[in-house]
Every structure is written in structure tokens, then in C-alpha cells.
Amino acid sequence: MAHAVSRAQNVTVTIRDVRGADELRACQDLQRRAWGITEDGYVLPVATMAGAQKVGGLILGAFDAQNHLVGFAFAFLGRLKGRLILYSQLTGVHPAHQSTGIGRLLKFEQRRRARDMALDAVVWAFDPLQASNAAFNLGVLGATCRIYEVDMYGARTDALNAGLATDRLLAEWPTAAEPIAGRTEPYPDGVDLIHTTVVPGLGFRKVEHISPIPPAAAHLHIKIPGRISELKAYSSSSAAREWQNALRETFQAAFAAGFVAVGFSRAEPDQPCYLLERTA
């Protein structure tokens, strides 16, 4: 088990396996709270979680000193490009405990368990438009991305996904070596693929045009909005869809050309960017 102290409320947190139906139901409640889910169809069934646990799935919980669930992570065995992996479907933290390091503890325990099972990597999907997730996954954990999935889950109506396709990047976190934090500073020779302009009077940026990848480029920058939720609120998702289409085009082109996303920079808060390097 792993232990840590939540900086926000000075709560001692224990990371351990979730046990029994009551704790699995607590995982359901936490899903609703963490992501604002109101439709039961988007919540993992207790039977699914219990069944996965019996055949190699992993459900980790973060419990406070009163044994209340404040975070959890659900993962199962999978195969990606011929490699056995631990696929992390969900990692969520109660809103009162977010940004306190609990998510990091859960991910590192997942990685330790995957290594003990002789699995090559922990893999999970995330929305490339969400800057905080990108900064955590690539910058803090040191995961990399080389696969872009178009509309991975189909249309959804929950608050986080409504109005957009569910495009996702796959984060890959190898278990063979000790993890190293990803790059967080732009490359001096990085080529910007997405060019933006500020919308007068609103303060957010929209896509102006996309540049092709120069044949000799070694490093790329792919920009995203600083605050996608605010942009969606101002534009009823139309500007967000333009951004999503731009990311889809540039990531697919970059990955096809042999680039890998290895970091994320917030040097410019209103237009953070993914950092990619050529590997082939």
C-alpha cells in the first residue's frame, strides 16, 4: 500500500485495493462527483468492476483516515500492438481533494502493479483538448503519445463531452525503467503547426491556419486552447470543434510522419502546446 498526505486538507490517504460491493458502489458515487455525471449509463456497473477484479483487473481506491473513498482508478489487462499492458479506463478524485497529489499516487501504484505483473506499460486515453490532463500525463508522469483515436466513445451528452466528438490521445507509460518527467519547455527549433488569433472582445484564441510538417523538422509544437471549457461556453462549441478538427489533422499527420508527443508546455498560458520529437 502507498501513503501520502493531502496538502489541501491535511488528510492522510491510503492507496489500496477496493474491496466488496459497498466500496464498489462508493466508486460509482465518486464517478458521478468527479465528472459531474448525471446519467447512469456512463457509470461503471458494480458487476463489471467485480467481474474484472476476479480475472486480473485492478481497482485501486484512495481512502482517508475515516476510510472514506476520495479517489479511485479502474484498470484491466489489455493488448496494444502486440504488447501486454494494463489499460487504465478511469482515474477520478473527489472534487474536494483534486490537485492534491492523489491522482499521482493512484497512477504510480497502477504502474507498480503493472510492473509486478510483468506488463510492458500502463496505457490510458485522455481528451487532448484538456490542458490540465495533458500537463499531468506528459509533463508530470512522463507518459508519451503516438496514437490518436477519432471519436473513441461515440457521441456523449455529459458536461465534459457534449457538443464534441470523443477524440482521444493514448498515453503510454512504460514499466521497464524508472519514470522521468516529460519535457515542459518549448523546443528552440520547434515548428508550430497550429496558428491562432485572438477573438476581439472575448479573449480566447481560435484556429487561423495549419502549417504542413517540414520534411527536415526534428521537433513540433501543437497548440491547444488554454481553457477549453470557457471557449465552449462562449462559442456554443463551434470554436471548440474547429480546435478539435485542427488537433485531429495535425496529430494524425505528425504520428504518421514518425513523431511522438513527449511533453507539454504551459510557457504561454493562453495557448499551451504539446511537444513532439521525431523518432523515425
Question: Where are the predicted features?
Answer:
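A conserved beta-strand-loop-helix scaffold within acyl/acetyltransferase catalytic domains
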Residues: I15-P95, S265-A267
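A cross-family glycoside hydrolase active-site/sugar-binding cleft signature
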Residues: Q89, A125, E172
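Short coil/turn segments at alpha/beta junctions that flank glycine-rich nucleotide-binding fingerprints
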Residues: T38, T100, M117-A118
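Intrinsically disordered, low-complexity, positively biased terminal segments
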Residues: M1-R7, G20, M117, Q130, ...
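Residue-level recognition of the GNAT/N-acetyltransferase active site
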Residues: H94-A96, D127, P225
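Conserved acetyl-CoA-binding loop-helix of GNAT-fold acetyltransferases
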Residues: V93, S99-A114, N133, W243-A246
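Conserved GNAT acetyl-CoA-binding A-motif
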Residues: A114-D127
